[in-house]
Amino acid sequence: MIARNIRSQLAVFFTLAVLAVAPGIAGAQELGDRLPKIDLPGLSTYAPAQDTSPLATASLGRITLAAQLIQDGGDITRGLVWRIFETEPGADGKLRLVASAQGGTQSFDLTPGQYLVHASYGRAGATKRISVGNDAKREAFVLDAGGLKLDAENSGGVRIPSDKLRFSIYEAEEKPGGERALILPDVSPNTVIRLNAGVYHVVSTYGNVNAVIRSDIKVEAGKLTEATVEHRAAEMTMKLVRQAGGEAIADTSWSVQTNSGDPVRESVGAYASMVLAEGDYTIVAKNRDHIYQRDFTVEAGHNAEVEVIADESTPTAVEGAD
């Protein structure tokens, strides 16, 4: 079920070439397109291709490999990674990597026989067994994949600075114990991620404390899914002062707690700045063996400064505290 705090827009990819060269895609896939990052279904290890004599011997067959996002779609012209393996493991128990290439459609000259071919496109991919004969042939891979672009805003449509926003993409299905397999961490906003069609669990983090939103998002083959998450949080800055509007007192230890007393964040300095989810909190400030505290409320979208008055005549000052 798609979370109600998601606003999704689907836009059909105009052509596969457009998807391959869309702004930001190349950078977004840098983790997925490196040759060592392969994750083949049922293939945990493989032997690297051996640097032997060229394959161009008397009897080779040419195989041309192409891939599309959807059935009858246009060929993907860039961003693919092809890996060709022998079908039987060697003495070391690994499948030997016969050949590999990057780009779009690729042709290989191989000894006739059976091979396993893996095509990866970002985080999308497919594996297929092929047969190579003496005659040239073409094999097409349908990746059944699409793109996902994520963004977030604060309550009321307030834009969140991109440097304070990150996403993590997980498999939707939970494993025993409630855990999910992590697909891609630390995704920047407005980055296009290529994924196989399906539902994914997305975690959006605003800041680095407790402003976290979780959503299930569906990726459709051949389409770009744009999802905007709504956070309900605010950036808060705390300072200890001797009087309202005064200068912040240095060397202050800070502890932020929920109204039930659960710790949220600790820091040291004249100021304590952090993003907090909306709700009620207590801020505790310790300076020179004195402890001061104040209750405050975080309202979504309303960034604010919280002053704690260092008034030693009030009951909140505790002398001799450790």
Regions found by a protein language model. Give the residues of each.
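N-terminal secretory signal peptides that target proteins for export/translocation
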Residues: 1-8
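Short, acidic Ser/Thr/Gly-rich low-complexity loop/linker segments typical of extracellular
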Residues: 87-104, 174-189, 258-270
